[in-house]
Design a protein with these regions (language model features):
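Short, structured interface segments
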Residues: 112-122
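N-terminal helix-cap/turn-to-beta initiation motif at the start of protein domains
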Residues: 17-31, 121-144
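Beta-strand residues in well-ordered beta-sheet regions across diverse protein folds
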Residues: 33, 57, 83, 106-108
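N-terminal glycine/threonine-rich, aromatic-flanked beta-hairpin/loop signature
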Residues: 40-90, 144
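Structural motif
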Residues: 35-39
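Sec-dependent bacterial lipoprotein signal peptides
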Residues: 1-16
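Short, solvent-exposed coil/turn segments at beta-strand boundaries
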Residues: 26-27, 46-55, 75-79, 95-105, ...
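Short, exposed beta-strand-loop hairpins at the edges of beta-sheets
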Residues: 103-113
């Protein structure tokens, strides 16, 4: 009987160790509201995740229109990574955390830089004020 209890305990222990974290659901559109590394610089960023595809609209303080970058992304547990349409990888793999109410997404880069996004639909004032989609490797200043 004692051996059976030890055996059952061992099975339960191994089963508990085998559980993995579920993927963070980043589906939807997000607006950058805060970034730890930007002090005084103004940047406006919108990100939309749909299926495994993403679109990123970004505009710096000196720009009058948004640049748009398309690509694909994947989520593995709490890690998110991606590639742009030209095949180049994002600058980092990010740790993704969503608030309990699902309205805030926090991405933490390997460098420790933290970006906070609020769930919001990308407005037409952004999508209609966009330079042609950036798809080549010569575009500078990609957000992710």
């Amino acid at each position: 009987m004692k051996k059976i209890l030890v055996f059952i305990s061992a099975i339960l222990l191994f089963a508990a160790c085998g559980k993995s974290n579920p993927d963070v659901n980043v589906e939807g559109s997000w607006h950058l509201t805060e970034i730890s590394s930007l002090k005084g610089d103004v940047v406006d960023v919108w990100i939309s995740f749909t299926g495994n595809e993403c679109s990123i609209w970004q505009k710096g303080s000196a720009e009058d229109r948004y640049s748009k970058f398309n690509g694909q992304f994947s989520v593995n547990g709490d890690k998110i990574s991606g590639k742009y349409a030209d095949g180049s990888s994002w600058g980092d793999t990010y740790k993704a955390e969503k608030s309990g109410d699902g309205k805030t997404l926090t991405l933490t880069a390997g460098s420790g830089e933290v970006s906070t996004y609020t769930k919001a639909e990308v407005p037409t004032t952004v999508t209609s004020n966009t330079y042609s989609t950036k798809a080549d490797g010569t575009s500078a200043g990609r957000w992710l």
